[in-house]
């Protein structure tokens, strides 16, 4: 298991913020913290207050995952496993992390997973030291995550 957790918060980038970031980047106007979140391997530590302030802003929608969905993530998605991922097609694009999961144990952050459903890339940081993420992210897992995320975005 990648994270020791009892609850999961899901953050979804709002479409209007995504469009404004792309437009501003084209104009040379950059929000370096937001660009780090959206495009990069950031944060590099769990207790980064700037990261949490930014994802708790109006730029993201926040959802508390149900116990059932958190259990699904624990038992089927974020686990150490052997997969045949190496035989799947690799995608070569720059990730755009629109979907972020924050894992908590007793209200303390135990991990972060940033997911790019568009190109199949991910960034994971955990309080556990020896996690193996190489086999994470099969097409089936991304399809399951997309379905899960969409179920929370519905109004």
Regions found by a protein language model. Give the residues of each.
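Function-determining sites in protein domains
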Residues: 1-155
């Amino acid at each position: 298991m990648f994270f020791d957790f009892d609850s999961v918060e899901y953050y979804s980038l709002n479409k209007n913020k995504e469009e404004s970031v792309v437009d501003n980047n084209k104009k040379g106007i950059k929000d370096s913290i937001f660009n780090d979140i959206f495009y990069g391997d950031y944060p590099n530590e769990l207790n980064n207050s700037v990261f949490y302030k930014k994802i708790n802003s109006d730029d993201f929608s926040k959802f508390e995952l149900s116990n059932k969905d958190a259990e699904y993530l624990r038992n089927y998605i974020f686990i150490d496993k052997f997969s045949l991922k190496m035989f799947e097609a690799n995608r070569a694009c720059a990730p755009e992390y629109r979907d972020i999961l924050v894992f908590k144990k007793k209200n303390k952050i135990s991990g972060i997973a940033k997911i790019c459903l568009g190109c199949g890339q991910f960034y994971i940081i955990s309080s556990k030291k020896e996690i193996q993420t190489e086999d994470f992210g099969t097409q089936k897992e991304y399809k399951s995550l997309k379905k899960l995320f969409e179920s929370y975005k519905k109004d």
